[in-house]
Swiss-Prot record:
One of its GO terms (biological process) is protein targeting. The gene is secE. It comes from the Bacteria. GO terms for molecular function: protein transmembrane transporter activity. It is a single-pass membrane protein. This is Protein translocase subunit SecE. The lineage of its organism: Bacteria, Pseudomonadati, Spirochaetota, Spirochaetia, Spirochaetales. It comes from Treponema pallidum (strain Nichols).
Amino acid sequence: MLKFAKFRRECVAEFRRVVWPARTQVHTAVKVVLVSTVVMALFLGLIDALFVALLSFFF
């Protein structure tokens, strides 16, 4: 039990030292990730459709 208490105290101390990002930074990062994901999904979907069309042309 003593080890757990020490671990918990160290975790709390570490969380107090963390510099958390501002809300606007988080929103910007989320937007970048979402846009990047959608763009990549569209790109991969287009490549997949091209491969399907190309392979159906030969087979």
